[in-house]
């Protein structure tokens, strides 16, 4: 197995590219990220590690703009993400200068996925150890979009999805609870999904909301705490209702 294990461009006899599978494992060990598409907004939420006491929290952002109308969150290796984000931003700017129009969300998703795929079959490089969630608004139709890419270069569109640590649990939660929502309800669904795996509440969650009119806005910690408190109150009320004795008719 060792021969196929080391060579990035060589398939194993049973059809595996082990370096790509190892990159997918790096994603599975990364912090959880979730994206939810609403009718008038799109929300990205990520699990963030506790920062050191003297660290500037503003320097640790996991949700970033690629363009005024497109944002990205990722799970996996942060250094790999920095390289991919910079390449994507340059492509967005180049497209504006060349075509004199902003990129569509699908266009930049295809570009990022193509770059990830290229690094699975080129010598002297290794696959990107990250999966991305890309959200934005189409500059022509104004409709919100959510896409995911993975280290193999595969991409697909979603109504809601998760990647990173315990992504299967989050995805199951979204499948059970997703419905077309708007405004604050979309934000609440994304945070509820993250709370399935984040045990420390709102302090270890980063959330950003994108709307067509206002672009991307990072939620303040106090806003996240207020929504988490609202979710906890709803859970407590639901539990109390279950335990309450049935009323006589």
From Swiss-Prot:
CDD domains: proteasome_alpha_type_7. SUPFAM superfamilies: N-terminal nucleophile aminohydrolases (Ntn hydrolases) (SSF56235). InterPro entries: Ntn_hydrolases_N (IPR029055), Proteasome_alpha (IPR050115), Proteasome_alpha-type (IPR023332), Proteasome_asu_N (IPR000426), Proteasome_sua/b (IPR001353). Pfam families: Proteasome, Proteasome_A_N. PROSITE patterns: PROTEASOME_ALPHA_1 (PS00388), PROTEASOME_ALPHA_2 (PS51475). GO terms for cellular component: cytoplasm; nucleus; proteasome core complex, alpha-subunit complex. The keyword Nucleus applies. GO terms for biological process: ubiquitin-dependent protein catabolic process. It is found in: Cytoplasm; Nucleus. Keywords: Cytoplasm, Nucleus, Proteasome. The 26S proteasome consists of a 20S proteasome core and two 19S regulatory subunits. The 20S proteasome core is composed of 28 subunits that are arranged in four stacked rings, resulting in a barrel-shaped structure. The two end rings are each formed by seven alpha subunits, and the two central rings are each formed by seven beta subunits. The catalytic chamber with the active sites is on the inside of the barrel. The proteasome is a multicatalytic proteinase complex which is characterized by its ability to cleave peptides with Arg, Phe, Tyr, Leu, and Glu adjacent to the leaving group at neutral or slightly basic pH. The proteasome has an ATP-dependent proteolytic activity. PANTHER family: PROTEASOME SUBUNIT ALPHA/BETA. Belongs to the peptidase T1A family. This is Proteasome subunit alpha type-7. The gene is PAD1.
